[in-house]
């Protein structure tokens, strides 16, 4: 519950476990009623894959992780409006807007820019949606397989299922033998 003391709301745009797409516009409209409150949106699972259902000008901060769009692991972006005052987590020089002392890693910055450009050019949404629909159709016909990802308002890039009678690791390794790669959990 928000009140006049709330200074930050942070929300995932796309849930990394079941793929739910959060109604960011609704959150924006709620946060607007609290002038001290800023809105951070975690774009990691949806950036470049799904068309935003909100305007970037209406959010105060956002984060992107490059490895989720085929970029370098350990490289990310924190975007924020000019009126946002962030405090540094390390003491040092005033480089990087005074947030992080030291020289910016130019190689990572260039790779991030290139990764974003390529990711935005190579949108596979329709193809991935067709694969998701195909999998849902086939899996729904198999007894004791439960689809946990919602059909509507969900990313087609994530399809979470449960098979209670089998060990997840065993299924994962059996599928690997068929060159089908799945995850049995989240490292996030």
Residue spans of the language-model regions?
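Pyridoxal 5′-phosphate
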Residues: 1-188
């Amino acid at each position: 519950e928000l009140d006049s003391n709330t200074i930050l709301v942070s929300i995932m745009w796309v849930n990394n476990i079941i793929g739910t797409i959060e109604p960011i516009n609704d959150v924006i409209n709620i946060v607007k009623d609290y002038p001290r409150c800023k809105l951070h949106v975690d774009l990691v699972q949806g950036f470049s894959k799904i068309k935003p259902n909100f305007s970037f000008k209406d959010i105060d901060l956002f984060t992107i992780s490059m490895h989720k769009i085929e970029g370098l692991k350990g490289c990310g972006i924190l975007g924020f409006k000019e009126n946002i005052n962030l405090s540094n987590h390390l003491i040092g020089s005033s480089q990087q807007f005074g947030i992080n002392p030291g020289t910016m890693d130019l190689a990572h910055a260039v790779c991030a820019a290139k990764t974003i450009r390529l990711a935005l050019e190579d949108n596979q949404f329709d193809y991935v949606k067709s694969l998701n629909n195909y999998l849902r159709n086939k899996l729904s016909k198999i007894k004791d397989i439960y689809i946990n990802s919602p059909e509507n308002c969900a990313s087609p890039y994530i399809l979470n299922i449960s098979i209670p009678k089998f060990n997840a690791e065993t299924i994962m390794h059996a599928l690997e033998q068929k060159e089908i790669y799945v995850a049995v959990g989240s490292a996030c």
